Amino acid sequence: MHMNKPLQAWRTPLLTLIFVLPLTATGAVKLTLDGMNSTLDNGLLKVRFGADGSAKEVWKGGTNLISRLSGAARDPDKNRSFYLDYYSGGVNEFVPERLEVIKQTPDQVHLAYIDDQNGKLRLEYHLIMTRDVSGLYSYVVAANTGSAPVTVSELRNVYRFDATRLDTLFNSIRRGTPLLYDELEQLPKVQDETWRLPDGSVYSKYDFAGYQRESRYWGVMGNGYGAWMVPASGEYYSGDALKQELLVHQDAIILNYLTGSHFGTPDMVAQPGFEKLYGPWLLYINQGNDRELVADVSRRAEHERASWPYRWLDDARYPRQRATVSGRLRTEAPHATVVLNSSAENFDIQTTGYLFSARTNRDGRFSLSNVPPGEYRLSAYADGGTQIGLLAQQTVRVEGKKTRLGQIDARQPAPLAWAIGQADRRADEFRFGDKPRQYRWQTEVPADLTFEIGKSRERKDWYYAQTQPGSWHILFNTRTPEQPYTLNIAIAAASNNGMTTPASSPQLAVKLNGQLLTTLKYDNDKSIYRGAMQSGRYHEAHIPLPAGALQQGGNRITLELLGGMVMYDAITLTETPQ
């Protein structure tokens, strides 16, 4: 009896050890080549690539996670995974013509599939496997080596997995198990990649879109396995802190849009001589139940962010020298977002450069970490309060390990008569603005409403977007009609009324006491009808109301939607300095 206890005590740990070792044991990274076919294996993960630069097998725990792939019937790539492509007047496949082994040691194997001349862009697709990491690091270098500009609507990596196994999508905010393409394509189609389900509800692949820089990871999971996109930094994505894109969607697809125009970002125009390194990011594979998978990838994401910039990457185009940029923005806004943009484009629609952003504390202080040396344009805008538009903008040079900018004086706000909403380039505070992305919300907004300053409530009486032709009225009183005022309208998004033909573009007639002041017209940012609830492409309008335009006592601003849809950030009436 006493002898059995020690035997039993030893037996359980031994059994546990035997079970765990295959999952955690690691060894040297091995590379096998057969022409342009390659296999990378570190004992935790084994990935075999074909000559076209896409994965043919992904082995984890004895299971090939891409053995059964699926997609839209019309998609020629529905049976491919881990591939790179771009859209420039049509889909352009990445067609590598050579494979380079850049580094091969027991700790790291670094390969690059390179397309020098088969497409409009010169592309390098780099694959890096390291010891002890159950995943594959990747980065892309895109260049225009031609003599004419190249317009690119999207440049992306697509990771497709077995949807019968990894059946759950997770975009870091919401999770779900949507129908697959072969089922969806039998249902009535509402619009682009949007279907009406048998229960009357609507599903769209855009339901699982998200804010790229806010999302630390996104992926697919199920039946004991998870696959995750883990970007250690978002500095190389297009747009700004509010850049949205597709992240995951049905058929177990993980997307990494290096640039994309689904939600207001314009097409990238790569001028001759353009070259940009995107990444690296980690495609991480793990095992466990759903809770364990998410907890594990969350820890992994924190580790990757803490390791940025990666010291193990030796590429002259990847700056490992970085600086911390700090300063203090003197502003009356409760908080502000401070942005550094390396390109000459407006920061919120930039596509060719790198972008860094940080939120000020209540004292106005900010710090941006890991900024490469160089010249940047600094822009700041309110993240709360009522001051619409840029607070400050200037050119800064980043040098050394620390760049201290000192105090930056923000534009002084004009005296405020009233405000609807918070000036933060988002519509969260309005009705439905806190809802998850879903097509239905745009159909539930009234065509006409009346909002009374001082009585109505933003959360209940003002909606995230004006989506139906009609008039929204703002009633307010003034005791000083002789004072000149400015009506400030910040638009968080402006979209067509859908993808039907013909579609109406966003047009908003602005009236004061029944008299037309102006008609605001915008290009289609494609955001609202694709389920965006907080933002798209930002616009602002400042409409002067000359002295005497207002009436003593009651006044009415009318916003008449003539076409398309508009999403509101904030509306204010301010005194015009004399």
Curated annotation (Swiss-Prot):
It catalyses: Endotype eliminative cleavage of L-alpha-rhamnopyranosyl-(1->4)-alpha-D-galactopyranosyluronic acid bonds of rhamnogalacturonan I domains in ramified hairy regions of pectin leaving L-rhamnopyranose at the reducing end and 4-deoxy-4,5-unsaturated D-galactopyranosyluronic acid at the non-reducing end. Keywords: Lyase, Secreted, Signal, Virulence. Optimum pH is 6.0. It is found in: Secreted. Its main location: secreted. One of its GO terms (cellular component) is extracellular region. It comes from the Bacteria. Belongs to the polysaccharide lyase 4 family. This is Rhamnogalacturonate lyase.
